[in-house]
From Swiss-Prot:
Record-linked SUPFAM superfamilies: UROD/MetE-like (SSF51726)
UniProt keyword annotations, A-Z: Amino-acid biosynthesis, Metal-binding, Methionine biosynthesis, Methyltransferase, Repeat, Transferase, Zinc
Keyword Repeat annotated: yes
Family note: Belongs to the vitamin-B12 independent methionine synthase family.
Group of enzyme by EC: transferase
Function, in words: Catalyzes the transfer of a methyl group from 5-methyltetrahydrofolate to homocysteine resulting in methionine formation.
Name of the gene this protein is made from: metE
Cofactor: Zn(2+)
Family annotation (InterPro entries): Cbl-indep_Met_Synth_N, Cobalamin-indep_Met_synthase, Met_Synth_C/arc, UROD/MetE-like_sf
Reactions this protein catalyses: 5-methyltetrahydropteroyltri-L-glutamate + L-homocysteine = tetrahydropteroyltri-L-glutamate + L-methionine
Chain positions recorded as Zn(2+) binding sites: 645, 647, 669, 730
Protein known as: 5-methyltetrahydropteroyltriglutamate--homocysteine methyltransferase
Positions bound to 5-methyltetrahydropteroyltri-L-glutamate: 17-20, 111, 519-520, 565, 609
Length: 762
């Protein structure tokens, strides 16, 4: 029985975000297509070489991309919407699908399962030529072999997951389209096998949440594929949860091996193996290192896991690997020496996780005693973190223990509150607003960098922020928006900003991960107990309000989003960490209210994405997520209007949860998802304030007034005009000023036209 190390995927962005910078240089026409291709090749080969040097036996090939691996698969299989047919080159089509263009709406973008990564949603339409348009995995496999002598492991998104993630077809069409995918996948696998690929990883993360009937359907698909490629060694890879509901079916699939997540699906997967065994003729790939978080492994638990498995099964081979792709972790921790010693020692980024895999292999091969020094070091680092003062704050623990039922509820029900708020705010019908942020121009970023480097004083930086704020208050007034925002020019990131001002958080210098396309984020680390220290947003918001007679919203990030967009300590339940954050935000909201701010927006874009993948686990998550939001917001007066915002989500599953938040107004991404939430509201009612986004801010394209009016018109068929707001999909931080101003002008024009029509029909 052989023992191997493997990786499921490696961060694309590069140690210094070289990947991001190359892409953006190409989009800005600072480099040409050939320079893009050459530089991307160099970055990819460097990533492969790192994994080789770390001792990984099966190095993934095909996880690298120019934008998104799901988009790669869509292009490869010919899922190219007809609206892009006038483009001729691969890159023009590819980036138009991802980002849109002046005349083309981009494909929808949404979260990859319950992670913080976004993928481009494949679109099916009648007449698609579903075929192997480009065998990209083969090209990359041969390149790695030729350039580096690496016999890699091609990684492919599986056909069942791919089609489940796609949109544009009815459920009745699913079996027919699935059948059409057999031929291109057979060709893809045949060519890889003939080229010498000794192992091919097929990712089917959707398998963790399929019904019995769907699993049987998926098995028939793989039987059809295996019949045509019988000698290819396929590893069917699952992750993000267990496969316990369908384990007995999965182990009969006609593949050489199966990969299971023993971190996020540990309990269910162990239970399945203990009860049902594992085929002796198959390889078991064991995801024993957390691919989604940044903490060092608990080696005692890892070796105990292997002892449990060995006691019940004898697979053909063992593969030691992360629980999922390392795409979700930063590249390397070596630059983070500014962190406290106990925190630094407790961290493991992607490169350190690869080292952990080789260490575990050595311990299993040569005996645990051979790595006793390393195990002792790990134990000491875990104990140092556990006993640290940051994780043992009595004030935080006392506040949590003192919570009462009334701390989670507003004094009056929504209808009564909203009437009081309308009297106080005097807003027009269909009020217009934005989601919060305005463009972070090169000047804004450069000035912030100068301030952080000590090149300008605090006073100079604050003066600059005030100038930007005033400029955009005037822009908003001139455009005719009804509720204004200060623009968030002082903030780098909607989570990082608050984490820097709360106790319990730590920050990396280079801990970047990919969010979507070239957009990278640097998640905070929730290391200790979270607590309020002092005002975080009051000064900037009050200043903005002093500049105008119109209402200015206070802008906060909600507790669930801060939790879901951070690397979270793994010694407490997530619910408890979220309650700590909510209590800290409650202080800030009370400070804003006492300073005269009458609308306070608490964004929760990550509420839906944090839901467990299995429906049986939803109720528990929704209960504490909703309670966390209410804990943060419930102490304000009835006249104070609480807003929230969500984006990138399949909201049909959580309409009841959205109601339960008891926010006075919610704004929701609508335009890029092609109006799916409008369809959801046709099936149910939502009698609270709501704004359905009227244009996609993730594309540089400026939509017309007519396009926005159409969305408003559709929305008003399912929403009460009394409670309806008009806004963009999301914040405008990543857009340019010359894109934002005309788009907002068109939005206000659309609102005026809609008001006129409503008054005419009244």
């Amino acid at each position: 029985m052989a023992l191997h190390t493997s990786n499921l995927g490696y961060p694309r962005i590069g140690l210094q975000r070289e990947w991001k910078k190359t892409l953006e240089a190409f989009w800005a026409q600072k480099i040409d297509e050939q320079q893009l291709i050459t530089t991307m090749k160099e970055i990819h080969l460097e990533h492969l070489n790192v994994q080789k040097e770390k001792g990984i036996d099966f190095i993934p090939i095909g996880d690298f991309t120019y934008y998104d691996h799901v988009l790669d698969t869509a292009y490869m299989l010919g899922f190219i919407p007809s609206r892009f047919s006038n483009f001729t080159s691969y890159l023009d089509i590819y980036f138009a699908m991802a980002r849109g263009s002046k005349d083309h709406v981009a494909s929808e973008m949404t979260k990859w399962f319950n992670t913080n990564y976004h993928y481009i949603v494949p679109e099916y339409e009648e007449g698609l030529n579903i075929s192997l348009k480009d065998n990209r995995p083969l090209r990359l496999y041969e390149e790695a072999k030729r350039e580096l002598g690496i016999d890699g492991k091609p990684v492919i998104l599986g056909p069942y997951t791919f089609l489940k993630l796609a949109k544009g077809y009815t459920q009745d069409q699913f079996p027919t389209i699935l059948h059409k995918l057999i031929a291109p996948y057979v060709q893809l696998l045949t060519e890889l096998h003939k080229a010498g690929a000794r192992l091919i990883q097929i990712d089917e993360p959707i398998f963790v949440s399929l019904t019995k009937e769907e699993m049987i359907e998926a098995k028939k698909l793989y039987e059809a594929i295996q019949k045509e490629v019988p000698s290819a060694n396929l590893i069917l890879q699952t992750y993000f949860d267990s496969v316990e509901e369908n384990y007995t079916e999965l182990i009969t699939f006609p593949v050489s091996g199966i990969g299971l997540d023993f971190v996020h699906g540990k309990e269910g997967n162990i239970k399945s193996i203990v009860e049902h065994g594992f085929p002796a003729e198959k390889t078991l790939a064991i995801g024993c290192i957390d691919g989604r978080n940044i903490w060092r492994a608990n080696l005692d638990e890892v070796f105990a896991l292997f002892e449990t498995l060995k006691a019940h099964i004898e697979p053909k081979d063992w593969i030691i690997q992360p629980s999922c792709s390392l795409l979700h972790t930063p590249v390397d921790k070596t630059e983070e020496t500014h962190l406290s010693p106990e925190l630094f020692d407790a961290l493991a980024f992607a490169n350190q996780k690869l080292e952990e895999l080789t260490l575990i292999k050595r311990g299993l091969s040569e005996g645990v005693n051979s790595i006793e020094i390393e195990i002792t070091t790990y134990r000491n680092s875990h104990e140092a973190v556990r006993s640290s003062a940051a994780r043992n704050r009595k004030d935080v623990q006392t506040a949590r223990a003192s919570l009462k039922e009334e701390d989670f509820s507003r004094p009056l029900p929504f209808e009564q509150r909203y009437d009081l708020q309308q009297k106080a705010l005097q807003l027009p019908l269909l009020p217009t607003t934005t989601i919060g942020s305005f463009p972070q121009t090169p000047e804004v970023r450069q000035t912030r960098k100068q301030w952080r480097n000590g090149e300008i004083t605090n006073e100079q930086y604050e003066h600059f922020i005030e100038q930007e704020t005033e400029k955009w208050i005037r822009h908003q007034e001139n455009i005719g928006l009804d509720v204004l925002v200060h623009g968030e020019f002082e903030r780098t990131d909607m989570v990082e900003y608050f984490g820097e001002r709360l106790a319990g958080f730590s920050f990396t210098k280079n801990g970047w991960v990919q969010s979507y396309g070239s957009r990278c984020v640097k998640p905070p680390i929730i290391f200790g107990d979270v607590a309020f220290i002092s005002d975080m947003t009051v000064k900037e918001t009050v200043y903005a309000q002093s500049l105008t007679n119109k209402v200015v919203k206070g802008m906060l990030t909600g507790p669930v989003t801060i939790l879901n967009w951070s690397f979270v300590r793994n010694d407490l339940p997530r619910k408890e960490v979220c309650y700590q954050i909510a209590l800290a935000l409650r202080h800030e909201i009370e400070r804003l209210e006492s300073s005269g701010i009458r609308i306070i927006q608490v964004d929760e874009p990550a509420l839906r994405e944090g839901m467990p993948l299995k429906e049986k686990d939803w109720d528990s998550y929704i209960e504490w997520a909703v309670q966390s939001f209410r804990l943060a917001t419930a102490s304000v007066a009835n006249e104070t209007q609480i807003h929230t915002h969500m984006c990138y989500s399949n909201f049909e599953d959580i309409v009841d949860a959205i109601r339960a938040l008891d926010a006075d107004v919610i704004s929701i991404e609508t335009s890029r998802s092609h109006g799916e939430f409008i369809h959801t509201l046709e099936q149910t009612t939502y009698e609270k304030g709501i704004g359905l986004g009227v244009y996609d801010i993730h594309s540089p394209r400026v939509p017309s007034k007519e396009e926005m009016y159409t969305i408003v018109e559709q929305s008003l068929k399912v929403c009460n005009p009394k409670y309806f707001w008009i806004n963009p999909d999301c914040g405008l931080k990543t857009r340019r000023t010359e894109e934002v101003l005309p788009a907002l002008e068109h939005m206000v024009e659309a609102a005026k036209e809609a008001r006129t029509l409503l008054k005419t029909n009244a």
